[in-house]
Amino acid sequence: MLTCIACTKQLNTNNGGSKKQEEDEEEEDRVIETPRSKQIKSLTSQIKDMAVKASGAYKSCKPCSGSSNQNKNRSYADSDVASNSGRFRYAYKRAGSGSSTPKILGKEMESRLKGFLSGEGTPESMSGRTESTVFMEEEDELKEWVAQVEPGVLITFVSLPEGGNDMKRIRFSREMFDKWQAQKWWAENFDKVMELYNVQQFNQQSVPLPTPPRSEDGSSRIQSTKNGPATPPLNKECSRGKGYASSGSLAHQPTTQTQSRHHDSSGLATTPKLSSISGTKTETSSVDESARSSFSREEEEADHSGEELSVSNASDIETEWVEQDEAGVYITIRALPDGTRELRRVRFSREKFGETNARLWWEQNRARIQQQYL
């Protein structure tokens, strides 16, 4: 029998159409079977979790037992990135999106993670925590700061942990102050500075004495009593154990406890205390080096006997006294165990004697003083 041509064409078209439909269905099944949105979301969430963990969010926590599982999950996520990118290549081409999108996302996140781990790129949160940690460490250390009390006067303070400040050094401008002007300024403004800057005053017996600082020219301005006579401290500061540099800078001077005791109780039964007579006294031993060289042998021994004072002053303190030779001139005399006397020091009131006048007075009256009191 002859078959109908129209039927044959229809069968052929049906067979061809069914094949196309099957191919389309297979492609749709592939697209449907591809977990496009779900896997992308899960991959993104896994990468975010890895980024958060790597950025140091759990840096303060102790390492737990699940760290090995996290490493496995990371390696599994990395393998998923490579496998999913290969599986989705064909489907993304059909959908019109580039196949390199998941690869770019995965590589970008991986590069960021590597940067976080290597320290090249630090998140803002992590850098903020680091800065706060460094700031707290700096707070534990003693901080020094400088205050300009007035033009030409700079004071260096140290902030104490328990509150208040400690005075480290005082600097005077050589263009505006000489040695005597600096001492006069300090005598007049000592209490104001201590109160204004909340300076804590410590007990000399419980606090270690500071070492003499270096001045601007690199030489130690303050000499110890063992090496030679030092620049005299003002009488107001003798009880506090403070001394002064000669010109450029002033600082604390280490003085022995027996010296401070000597200033406080030096047998002034017949003579008022020096602080009540004149707030600022100077010693002839510090007037000038040339004046020292003109002193007698007994005076130089008295000036250089700081070591003996610290050793035997406790037993001999009752044998020292002060005589007022004339207004503004005070002589300290010491009686030795063998019955002889020695001249300890001569002090002049700055209100009545300048440096030149004090030196001139001593040259004129040295013989009389030795004959009268020794």
Swiss-Prot record:
Signal peptide: none annotated. Residues 12-43, 57-80, 205-316 are annotated as: Disordered. GO terms for cellular component: nucleus. This is Protein Brevis radix-like 2. It comes from the Eukaryota. It is found in: Nucleus. Disruption phenotype: No visible phenotype. The gene is BRXL2. Residues 65-80, 246-259, 267-288 have a biased composition (Polar residues).
